[in-house]
Amino acid sequence: MARNFLLVLLWFIVQVSSSHENGRGDQALSQIDIYAINLAQHHSAFIHVSPLVLGSQGQDTEWVNVVISNPEPSSDDWVGVFSPAKFDSSSCAPTDDKEIAPFICSAPVKYMYAKSSPDYMKTGNAVLKFMLINQRADFSFALFTGGLSNPTLVSVSNHVSFINPKAPVYPRLALGKKWDEMTVTWTSGYNIGEAVPFVEWSRKGTRSRRSPAGTLTFTRNSMCGAPARTVGWRDPGFIHTASLKDLWPNLKYTYRMGHELMNGSIVWSKNFTFKSSPYPGQDSLQRVIIFGDMGKGERDGSNEYNDYQPGSLNTTDQLIKDLKNIDIVFHIGDITYANGYISQWDQFTAQVEPIASTVPYMVASGNHERDWPDSGSFYGGKDSGGECGVPAETMFDFPAENKAKFWYSADYGMFRFCVADTEHDWREGSEQYQFIERCLASVDRRAQPWLIFIAHRVLGYSTNDWYGQEGSFEEPMGRESLQKLWQKYKVDIAFYGHVHNYERTCPIYQNQCMDNEKSHYSGAFKGTIHVVVGGAGSHLSSFSSLKPKWSIFRDYDYGFVKLTAFDHSSLLFEYKKSSNGAVHDSFTIFREYRDVLACVRDSCEPTTLAS
């Protein structure tokens, strides 16, 4: 009987924790039934794209005009953007005898309904504007009728291409394993047998240096299941990472990526700048952005059916607008919501390039990056769309010992960040639990007073509706093992995503508020403040009708958090709206070193009266 009860409980946990509201059709491209596509080209219909050559001024993004003429217009006609431009069955992966190859083997990288042009339904003529990014291959556009569920190919356009499809693009900065290191990761079409990748960099008044880059990629066979192995597959190109070492603290550096071809010529990227990290414990102004579950948007309005990540562009644009006042960003899981449609990783890195090329863009693993049955993930859902962590671990760098175990520590000036991986076991006795305790225990709080815990799923507290139904207002098994660590090592704030809203607790320990103050905390540590900040872009999650006393601020809207450390004693917390950047919730912590040392409940080792 006990065994049957345990099996039922585990099934419930998987269902609640893996699906939640996230199991919906959350990737626009997944709505297209690729296997149902048939061919019925209309001799009087045509579609034409211009300009033919893109990026002639060095751009990696360009707008194109798509002219359509269709003598039989319908409200469900749509235009798909395909890359590579040749997308018929001749490009299909080999199939066994039991599997019938579809007419088209891959999903488009984006699509738009023809009726987006106001006169299309009246005249059958339309001009659509698409924004294309350099994705290492040419493009063609296809006109379909029959909607997304029963599409029929009517006409195919000419091909267009960037002047150099292989060019190095979309740099992503990350903290290295040492405080004076910064890594640069980027994407190109150059394999190491064709060109040697490197980064050239310098600070003002010094000679430039070159750092070699390692090159990685992944293949269809690296994916765990569909759609990543099937219609969602697209060659990711080559991902290069260089480590810039021996950086001086808090100085501005200029860099660019290069590929030296076999003939000795060099293909260069644009120039970029960043500010190096402060020395651990350095007393200087330090500003941190934290959010989860942003996903991506389309500036051209394509994929317009999909309102799954309606806040994504607003969050991105607010960060770009305030970039001069940001030092580092943490995107804590559910990064792209590509869900097995590999082309969307390029789309996302292009969207965040203005941010990620300028400040370290640190990521954590979420269910939409990692989860797949029988793949070693803690949850058995299919939220990754068959990616099982591979694109996230390859496309972004982070200072983990093992990329497949997505947990790491990061030091930035007066901050210590302990980043957990909720898609692997975190409970007491696990390898990750040991890491978390080491990360929390090893920080010198005199030098780094601000101790931050980060995880994707809510291992702490949330009044989200489905956590309320589950009964404990947390990810099942979430805080039972960890709360004694947060208390013992006096974690100031714990951040989570996964739940798509904003919520802040009181300083809390074992379900009890340890401090009734709401906006100004001072003196000795009493308990960890838990913050859900998963409302950066994806569809919003509703709150439970129950509101425990520990929940002191909730917001059903899109936003992100900014932490500002003024010195070793003063920290400002701000929750900002993505729509306008306005501060909607805030508090301050003032805590001197003697307050950090002060013994509170369950936070100090046993003492002796011996002299």
Curated annotation (Swiss-Prot):
Organism of provenance: Arabidopsis thaliana
Gene from which the chain derives: PAP27
Keyword Cytoplasm (UniProt): no
Binding site for Zn(2+): 334, 367, 456, 498
Biological classification of the source: Eukaryota, Viridiplantae, Streptophyta, Embryophyta, Tracheophyta
InterPro entries: Calcineurin-like_PHP_ApaH, Fn3_PAP, Metallo-depent_PP-like, MPP_PAP, Purple_acid_Pase-like_N, Purple_acid_Pase_N, Purple_acid_PPase_C_dom
Name of the molecule in the record: Probable inactive purple acid phosphatase 27
Tissues and organs where the protein is expressed, per its UniProt entry: Expressed in roots, stems, leaves, flowers and siliques.
Cofactor note: Binds 1 Fe cation per subunit.
Subcellular location: Secreted
Binding-site list for substrate: 367, 498-500
Position of the signal peptide: 1-18
